[in-house]
Amino acid sequence: MSAPNNNNNNTTTTTTTSPSPSQSSPTLTSVASNSTTTTTTETLTTPKLQFVVRSKTNAYQEIGQQYGKNLNLPSYSNGDCRHVEYSKDGTLIAYVNLNEIVICNSDGGSVHSVINRPNVGMISFSPQNSFLLTWERMSEYNNNENNLIVWDIKQASILYKTSQKYCNQENWPLIKWTDDEVLAGKLISNEVHFFNGRSIGVLAKKIKLQDISSFEFAPATNGGPYKIATFVPEKGSTPGSARIYSYPTVNEYCSHLKFFKASEAKVLWNKKGNAILVHTFTDTDKSGKSYYGETGLWFLSQDGSSFNLNIKGPIHDVQWSPTLDQFMVCYGNMPSQTTLFNLKGEPLVDFGLNPRNTIRFSPNGQLLCLGGFGNLQGDMDFWDLTRYKRICGTQSHCAIYTEWSADSVHFMTAVLSPRIRVDNGVKIIKYDNTIVYQENIPELYQASWRPLNPLVFPNERIVYPSIQQQKESSPQPQKYTPPSLRNMQAAPPVVTSPPAMGAPLPSGFKVYLASAKSSSTFKPKQKPSSTTTTNNTTTTTTKPAADEPKRELTPIEKKIRNVERKLKEVEVLKEKLNSGEFIPPTAIEKINNEQKFLEELRKLQSEL
């Protein structure tokens, strides 16, 4: 294991350490360096951020010279490293070299174990870091068999091995574990085989399903049964299907859904593990409207409820909120539309029309990055989801890797080879577009954040950039000037009034409210009053509440009072929303229930 390469002449590094006003940042570090930012208030209470990069000649993690490198952390500079990967919780990191796999502790860099196995192509840690799954191409070394192996990480010994001729990133990992590693599953020829998670190979249960192509375990639930989602593609006149099973009663499904136009699909579980989104694809469009096939989106819950959003045009990206029972879809021809939905498929917020195809929620669910990558220009918008306000916009041309750090403050973009062979490198910015770190790395193949538990980071107060910061960080394209006019005196700048908090909203932005009539149409009962008329003057006096006879409310009257209270809360929330004040996403759900409250109130009043 070689020392970190600190003097790479082909590497250009740019760092910026000034944080936003009133914004403290956790320390940024890397596996080849422990860094200390200018802000130290959080370094004793929050973990250090870390990321890994791998290029043609180097595999290391680096943040910048002035942050202070940690030479105890591993680095490879001989070009032998073929892949690098963190464990699910970020405590371990594996370097896949030509002849071995070196597993190190992410914090100190000490070697945890070494697996002597050449030519490994893919690896995957089990959720609790008990096992490492590896796959290699069949060769003379493995006698063209037993190329899929489960290793005991501590002992670096083989626990299970079998043959697997084909493997790609879409179906990897080929063996999957539940979050607690109690149960494992593997797709084998029209069946899903389930094993004891610590005794792979001993069959416990199986699901038989003709032409099944994928399955996914639900996230961990507190003491509940394990749930499995399966997908079967359409075949001829037979529709595709998605099903939800509950282990161990896998002989029958809990809920199912059938659909056409689904030769492939991506199945996404929500955070509670009780509903899935099925993002379907086809290679061709029979209607002839697209060269790239057709897409669809279906919702299926464990209790059997389901719906299709009937979205017109391509679906570019779908993501569940990491904290709420909501999901977001980016869809339509360019400029595309991005919409936040609830579990009933009702739209909550439209984020406007823009050339975007990527959705990235921050781990704490308070921030959102909408980007346009791939064949788009790399434009990005950062949104405050606590107020539904656009914070700022920026660009990252040709970015391949885009992801939030665990602190929900920093965002990394990376231009990677071999897809893009020029301008390779990484850039780390804050949500207000403050550039924290930038490095050009020729022939960069990998870049990724170290996984950390987002709950250990405090939710920072969201700070909006000033007008001057927005102008400096996002320069506007210049108007073309003919050469004959370039020496002429420039026109004086146009003075504009300062915008309100946040960047301008895109065209089509909309927050949906319930279509019901305002609850102000409900008139609460007035207290008894007496009216007297003297000299054409009418005087109304209201008896003090203390003079009213007291009596216990009936159950129906108590329910009416409770509904009235909810309607008053809705009125307050609507006023806050209209005035641009803070309103959490959960409050939108309450506003949308206004019609339901009114109907309940009318029904209760009719029972009096």
Curated annotation (Swiss-Prot):
Q: Name one GO cellular component term.
A: cytosolic small ribosomal subunit
**Ranges for region Disordered:** 1-42, 466-499, 520-554
User: InterPro entries from the entry?
Assistant: TIF2A, TIF_beta_prop-like, WD40/YVTN_repeat-like_dom_sf
User: In its keyword annotation, does this UniProt entry include Nucleus?
Assistant: no
Coiled coil ranges: 550-608
Instruction: State if Protein biosynthesis is listed as a keyword.
Output: yes
SUPFAM superfamilies on file:
DPP6 N-terminal domain-like (SSF82171)
The record's listing under Pfam families reads: eIF2A
Composition bias of kind Low complexity appears in 466-478, 520-544
Give the WD repeat ranges. Answer: 115-161, 207-255, 310-350, 351-393
One MF term in the entry's GO annotations: translation initiation factor activity
- The residue ranges crossing the membrane are none
Bias class Basic and acidic residues marks the residues at 545-554
Keywords of the record, alphabetical order, are:
Coiled coil, Initiation factor, Protein biosynthesis, Repeat, Translation regulation, WD repeat
Superkingdom to which the source organism belongs: Eukaryota
Task: Name the Gene Ontology biological process terms.
Answer: regulation of translation; translational initiation
Family assignment from sequence similarity = Belongs to the WD repeat EIF2A family.
Instruction: Tell me the function of this protein.
Output: Functions in the early steps of protein synthesis of a small number of specific mRNAs. Acts by directing the binding of methionyl-tRNAi to 40S ribosomal subunits. In contrast to the eIF-2 complex, it binds methionyl-tRNAi to 40S subunits in a codon-dependent manner, whereas the eIF-2 complex binds methionyl-tRNAi to 40S subunits in a GTP-dependent manner.
Q: What is this protein called?
A: Eukaryotic translation initiation factor 2A
Taxonomically, what lineage is the organism?
A: Eukaryota, Amoebozoa, Evosea, Eumycetozoa, Dictyostelia
